Amino acid sequence: VSIGIRLTEAAFSLSNPSLEFDAMNYSIQKFQNALSDAERQVLQLCLQEAMQAVPDDAVPWYLGDAASPTGYLKPEHAKVLLSLRQDWLTEPQGLRWDTPEKTPASRSLALAKLAAELSDLGHVTGWRNEKFSYWPDTTILANGHPIEPTDKLAAAFEMERAAYRFFGLRAHAVHVNGFTEDGYMWCGRRSMAKATDPGMLDNMAAGGLTVGESLQSCGVREMAEEAGLSEALALSAVAQGQVTTCRAVPRGWHYETLWVYNLLMPADLKPVNQDGEVAEFSLLSPQQVVQAIAEKQMTVDAACVVAHAVLHACGLQEVEQNGAVVQRAL
């Protein structure tokens, strides 16, 4: 079962490009020009594999009278929900949360109680005390164009982020590539204390979009916390669209839209972690970055963000996902 293609460009104009964009684009071009055809194919493969098919045994679940799935459950997770709540009903196409709660606030409260119970029973681990908002796809895409998922009132509900994979919900995150003028890239190595992908290479800064945050404020926060960058520098990051990744993971279904930003780092500035989530930063050549991706030393999401940024530097890029070729022009 395929849930389709999500590979779109952000709304920034090339008719009046900023100086920051010109310099950034030149840096990314240098990165790409340094790659061999084989190395470019490694990046292509990242995007080809970004969206995995939903497992055949996955159980879709629906919110109220929704026609499209809200999320995807592992079979054992579906059984747990049916054992805990009477308003989760079995239907031929999956489960339906036939909740009497009709407002985002009341749904959120009901789900908060359910998520806490699942955590107490050991079905949800790594509790973060951070909430993500859930928007149906139709809210994110307006007339075919991506919009910032920042309007809390437009969300169907909000929930503890640790429970998102259990329920197979689509989350959002901001990822920032740190390029230098000579086409090198700053990459962080995740702390060994991280619950997910400890010790692996990552983008310079990245983090989930929490309730009430804008994409820009999320990026500025993450660049300060993870890389020690000033707000003034962080605000110069250039948006470059989004790429969605989804795959089966031990805790459930990972489904996340990654909002890509590129930042041109000053030559005399090295990122310095502030929150303990990054063990070290390394300035890597294009070849070293691609080698890390090929050898699975970089997280899947970070690799997709790098591939998205680099392969789109030349304007028109063909990417095959789930058997279909997508063409997008900057």
What label would you give each PLM region?
Residues 1, 9-11:
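Acidic, Ala/Val/Gly-enriched low-complexity intrinsically disordered segments
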Residues 283:
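Short aromatic/basic micro-patch
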Residues 11-12, 16-200, 208-224, 229-272, ...:
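N-terminal leader/linker segments that precede catalytic domains of diphosphate-processing enzymes
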